[in-house]
Structures are given as C-alpha cells and as structure tokens.
Amino acid sequence: MTGISLALNPRQVFGNKNKFLRAQGITPVHIFGHGLKSLALQANTQELESTISRAGSSHLVSLKLDTDKKTRKAFIREIQRHPVKGYLQHVDFYQINLKEKVTAEIPIHFSGESPLLKEKGHKLTAPFTHLTVEALPDDLPPEIHIELSQFDSPEKDLYIKDIVLPGNARILNEPDLLVAKVSEIHLKVETPVTASLPEEPEEKPAAAAEEKETAEKE
C-alpha cells in the first residue's frame, strides 16, 4: 500500500455550528497526542472517507496542515457517525512520535494457493483476522502476509512463533497460538431412524369378561 496522506485546514467553527460545515462537505477533525496540544481542524469529507477506508486503525496517515511546513504522522483513533444516517460527524487522529514504538492491530492477508485446498474435502482454519504488533511507526507492516502454498500436508500448522516480521516489528500475541492450518473435512453420516409402528393396546380384563358373559347368554 502506498503512503496515505490527508490535507487539513484550521477550524474556526465549533459546537452546534459544525452542522453547517457538514452541510458543505466538510468534517470536523481533532489531532491530539502525547505532549501535544489538541488541534481543532477540518477536512474534506470525501477525502476523509477515502482515508478511513484505506487506513483503518492500523495504518499511519500523513497529515498535511496548510499552516505547517512539517507532515504529522498519526493513526485514526476515533470515528463518530450519525447513529441513524451514518454520515461522518467527527474524526480524531492520534499523532505519534516516530522515535517511539507503537502498538497496532495489523490485518492478516492470505495469498497463493494450497495444494490441499484445491482438493475437495479440505478447509482452511484461521482463528485470527488481526494480530497485535509492536514496532517503530515507520516499521509497522501494512499487513501480515501468509503464503498458502506452504500448506501442502494436513500436518502443517502455522503458529505465531513461526511468523517473521521485517525490521524490529514483533508480534505481541502468545507465540503458541495457532494462526492457520488446513485440515480434512469429516462428514458425519447419520443413521436413518426407522419409524416403529405403535403397539395395539392390550384388551382390558373387564371388557374381555363382559364379552365372554354376553357370548354365554347367547
């Protein structure tokens, strides 16, 4: 993924007046961070939606302020939307220090083909969609890539301890947790249940005696 950038401008409108900004296709934004005074800004709503779609919560965004000569690196921290209509109401960015390690949820991406998955009767088990990674901001991988071609036998399991990340990035999840495996699908064959005929009720003694007495009288 190429670098993600977003242009921001100073905001002079606050509180309930922000609805007039939204009507013009502008969304209120805040930047905050460790040792940083919160900045009230605004962004083009369409550009902001595109940034959210591309960056999620795990990719760094280069924020470009027209009043700043420097580019600020930040994560999307919080997104507020209208509870019914779903449009953007507000977005918070958290500016980070490029010299300090950060922690982020990085998505897992599977690619390639497994010889076993081409065959019928096998399935991929992958309990995780994201893993927790710690690294310097510029060393955070955009995704954790797993090649499916390595799964060439049912005995092949991939654990967190088997994944090697570039640079100084490291996975914080427990190393012995299973990340992926290809296993056989075992179909459960159910034995059909044979319906049994209801038993005829036994003749009551009183009724039998009554029939015998009637027969003798005749």
From Swiss-Prot:
Annotated keywords: Ribonucleoprotein, Ribosomal protein, RNA-binding, rRNA-binding
Signal sequence segment: none
CC terms in the record's Gene Ontology section: cytosolic large ribosomal subunit
Annotated GO biological process: translation
CDD domains recorded: Ribosomal_L25_TL5_CTC
Purpose of the protein: This is one of the proteins that binds to the 5S RNA in the ribosome where it forms part of the central protuberance.
Membership in a protein family: Belongs to the bacterial ribosomal protein bL25 family. CTC subfamily.
Name of this chain's protein: Large ribosomal subunit protein bL25
Organism: Dehalococcoides mccartyi (strain ATCC BAA-2266 / KCTC 15142 / 195) (Dehalococcoides ethenogenes (strain 195))
Lineage of the species this protein comes from: Bacteria, Bacillati, Chloroflexota, Dehalococcoidia, Dehalococcoidales
